[in-house]
A protein has these predicted regions:
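Active-/binding-site microenvironments in catalytic and ligand-binding cores
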Residues: 1-141
Length: 141
């Protein structure tokens, strides 16, 4: 099994969503002072690569700590479809991918590599997405 790290490294310079605070790293203890190093990290739950919990948009939705972590560890199919700003991946795009690379197995977790991660990480509003036709097609499999 090949493992893909989907995260963006967190630093004080990471772009943050407009209105969100930048992360702060504070030295709390040091080897010289207490024989160990310890840092405090303060950051928004929307810093870097993250999962939006249902609570983010639904008042009675589950909060991030209430979600079972095992649901985020999956075997997945990596589908490379280059996309431009504000371009949706369609059912037709997925069918074309399957013709070239083989059918996506039923029940698969699908990760799309659009090339967008190579773009500026300051543009939060025009990234590619999934068209409704594509989402319905994948759910039907």
């Amino acid at each position: 099994m090949k493992v893909y790290d989907l995260t963006i490294p967190i630093s004080e310079k990471i772009p943050t969503f407009p209105g969100s605070p930048a992360p702060h790293f504070i030295e709390w203890d040091s080897l010289e002072q207490d024989n160990y190093n310890l840092e405090m990290i303060f950051l928004s739950t929307h810093t870097g690569t993250h999962i939006d919990a249902p609570y983010h948009f639904v008042k009675s939705g589950k909060k991030i700590h209430e979600l079972d972590p095992s649901r985020f560890l999956q075997n997945a199919i990596l589908v490379r479809i280059k996309s431009k700003a504000n371009q949706a991946i369609t059912k037709s795009d997925i069918i074309q991918y399957e013709k070239k690379h083989g059918k996506i197995p039923n029940g698969s977790t699908v990760i799309f590599a659009t090339g967008w991660n190579d773009k500026s990480r300051k543009d939060f509003f025009s990234n590619p997405g999934l068209a409704e036709s594509a989402a319905k097609y994948l759910v039907s499999k």
